[in-house]
Amino acid sequence: MSHQRPEIFDNFAGAQVMTVDGEPQRDLNQARRIVLEMKEPLCRIPEDLRSLLSVTISVYCIETPSALVSTIIKNMPPEASIALVTGCRFLAVRDGPRGKTVTVLSTAFLSGLDESVTQQLFIHADTLLLTPEARSRISLLQDIIEDPPTSFETVGHIAHYNLREAHLPYRYFIGAVTCEKEPAITTVITKIDTVQSQYRTYNFELIGGVPRYDVKLVQDGITYSFNYTKVYWNSRLSHEHLSLAQHINQTICPNDLVLDGTCGIGPHALLLAKRFNFTNLICNDLNPDAYKSLKMNVRINKAENAITCFNEDVSSLLRRLLPETNLKAVIFSLPELSINLLQAMKGVPDIYCFLECFTRAPPHLAYYDLLLRCSESLLDTKVCTGIQQALSDIEKVAENKELIDLLIACYETFEVKEIRTVSTNKFMYRVTLKINEQKETVKVLKK
């Protein structure tokens, strides 16, 4: 038997609600003045801001016997993301973009309720006060900042923002809101310069929470422990860490000797050891703090039998290892220097090299740019002027089929894969190459 909805639902199905404007507690100019006067990192929104950031909205609500609340909640549509149960009153509203209407009690929701339930409902208009506790992080930021930052990198309990210049006057408000609205976050920082140091660390400012920088996190089944201020770590590269480990596993054998020459705290080697059962790994990093964390992570993950750790210049280490070992693969994951580090591999054939590197060439020329620059390092031949060369030069070389064929002949394998866009006109790629005997090719190139 079909059920018909009571006529009262026709008045409220798909109802729209708007923020109530003109209320004294919504003096956002006063709120901005308080925000701009904030002078230190906080763990929550200051008390004198809380009432100014509360908003009253008009809603339609359902009044129903308490016994039916669970039934109604089960049928609640996705748009009703804020659900409050107070006594026998059920309020549902979706918080939407500022100044726009939002849907409450969609037709689909009302139609999905059994008639025995709908007959016991009473729907009426009401108002609902949303305090900062009930509002989202982004909606709070939008009240104060015209174009607020919406995303950050999460590193354990640390939220890492890259704030633009226009956001800096609001940084302590951003930090306080992030700490309060993100339960897992207790420390909020913003980077204040680019990665320029020898060890790829950078300067930052604490803008929210407490200055606690020792991190412990689990990623793809591997536990990492490190001090975020002293080593390089980018959570956005987690997919690439696993992808590279999978690629290496598909390329060589688990008992082959592999050197991770710029390993940081060890993500590639630890994944190879624990996920793919590699047994003969050498890890090296020049940063003493990264080396300390690397040894700790090897111990935490019980990989001591598979990984040997070094703390020295990778070129010196290679000069020692190449004549003494049967090295099968090398990983260079320091993008600014990876291609330069290939110089240590000159004249060494039949070893796979896995590089992470940058290019400013557009996607259709990236392969040729990376081929030219890798060849310059490996062949000791100045074919072109490198990463700062004019794109027109790369285009000319890309059109020179004879030269490209000569370069490709130097390699048994030369593959490139885009990893991510770092910034405008700056891209990160993975290069996989294996060197052939090169003597004849070098002679031709030097003519």
From Swiss-Prot:
It catalyses: guanosine(37) in tRNA + S-adenosyl-L-methionine = N(1)-methylguanosine(37) in tRNA + S-adenosyl-L-homocysteine + H(+). One of its GO terms (molecular function) is tRNA (guanine(37)-N1)-methyltransferase activity. The keyword Ligase does not apply. SUPFAM superfamilies: S-adenosyl-L-methionine-dependent methyltransferases. One of its GO terms (biological process) is tRNA methylation. It is found in: Mitochondrion matrix; Nucleus; Cytoplasm. PROSITE patterns: SAM_MT_TRM5_TYW2. Pfam families: TRM5-TYW2_MTfase, TYW2_N_2. Its EC number is 2.1.1.228. The keyword Lipid biosynthesis does not apply. It is an enzyme of class 2 (transferase). InterPro entries: MeTrfase_TRM5/TYW2 (IPR030382), SAM-dependent_MTases_sf (IPR029063), TRM5-TYW2-like_MTfase (IPR056743), TRM5/TYW2-like_N (IPR056744), tRNA_Gua_MeTrfase_euk (IPR025792). S-adenosyl-L-methionine binds at residues 241, 285-286, 313-314. Specifically methylates the N1 position of guanosine-37 in various cytoplasmic and mitochondrial tRNAs. Methylation is not dependent on the nature of the nucleoside 5' of the target nucleoside. This is the first step in the biosynthesis of wybutosine (yW), a modified base adjacent to the anticodon of tRNAs and required for accurate decoding. Monomer. HAMAP family: TRM5. Belongs to the class I-like SAM-binding methyltransferase superfamily. TRM5/TYW2 family. This is tRNA (guanine(37)-N(1))-methyltransferase.
